[in-house]
Amino acid sequence: MKNMTVIVNCFDYTAIAQKAHRINKLPSIVCYERPADFPKKFVARLFYLGNETITTNVVVTGDTYEELLEKINPVLDYLGMVRFNRAPGDDNCIMEVWL
């Protein structure tokens, strides 16, 4: 059975940091503008990067980019994440990646 998407109001930054340490992977948040599964929303998805990427089913959504950033800023600050623009080969709905 495929994991259902879990929409949360904000990411739990302590849980993310603890899991990243436990599994020895780098947390990453990818921000999207109106992806296919949320065509009217801005979405932030949580991933863990390493030798293999772990895709989680946890997302934060916002009606605007500003609202989305407001919701994810605590985790960005807590983890000291840095913003990267989308890469040329990325899906057009990807806005940015935080590492």
Language-model features: locations:
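Short N-terminal "domain-start" leader segments
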Residues: 2-41, 73-81
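Cysteine-rich, disulfide-bonded extracellular modules and peptides in secreted proteins
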Residues: 17, 49-53, 92-95, 99
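N-terminal, helix-rich and Lys/Arg-enriched segments in bacterial and organellar proteins
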Residues: 21, 27, 41-46, 60-65, ...
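Short aromatic-glycine-(Arg/Gly/Cys) micro-motifs in beta-strand/loop hairpins
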Residues: 35-54
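A short, charged, amphipathic alpha-helix used as a generic interaction element across diverse proteins
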Residues: 57-83
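Short, mixed-charge low-complexity intrinsically disordered segments
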Residues: 79-99
